[in-house]
Amino acid sequence: MSKVIHVTSNEELDKYLQHQRVVVDFSAEWCGPCRAIAPVFDKLSNEFTTFTFVHVDIDKVNTHPIVKEIRSVPTFYFYVNGAKVSEFSGANEATLRSTLEANI
């Protein structure tokens, strides 16, 4: 069962960014690579239980200042104690996994 939280508002996103360890998947419904990496993101949410996994559809939550920074999808941001510690763009499972491992 997926532990991914699907954020639908700026307020929700702000709340989850304050968790101890967070990975945010910024994506869009129309994005093929986003759809391809989604099952991997779901699977990793069960493996890396110390992280809060958050999904943000940039077309639905599009007024948040962080979302306005996104230039390509999928983009993943990693936060520890409210501070961004890493990011990358692209549907790359190995990079996603290694970045999670580096921030445990």
Curated annotation (Swiss-Prot):
InterPro entries associated with the record: Thioredoxin (IPR005746), Thioredoxin-like_sf (IPR036249), Thioredoxin_CS (IPR017937), Thioredoxin_domain (IPR013766)
UniProt keyword list: Disulfide bond, Electron transport, Redox-active center, Transport
Any one Pfam family match given in the protein's UniProt record, by short name: Thioredoxin
Site feature location: Deprotonates C-terminal active site Cys: 25
Family matches, as PROSITE patterns: THIOREDOXIN_1, THIOREDOXIN_2
Keyword hit for Ligase: no
Positions of the record's site feature: Contributes to redox potential value: 32-33
Protein name: Thioredoxin-3
Disulfides per UniProt: 31-34
CDD domains membership: TRX_family (cd02947)
Family of the protein in this entry: Belongs to the thioredoxin family.
An annotated GO cellular component: extracellular matrix
Species, as recorded: Dictyostelium discoideum
Residue span, Thioredoxin domain: 2-104
Molecular function GO terms recorded: disulfide oxidoreductase activity; protein disulfide isomerase activity; protein-disulfide reductase activity
Function statement: Participates in various redox reactions through the reversible oxidation of its active center dithiol to a disulfide and catalyzes dithiol-disulfide exchange reactions.
List of catalytic residues: 31, 34
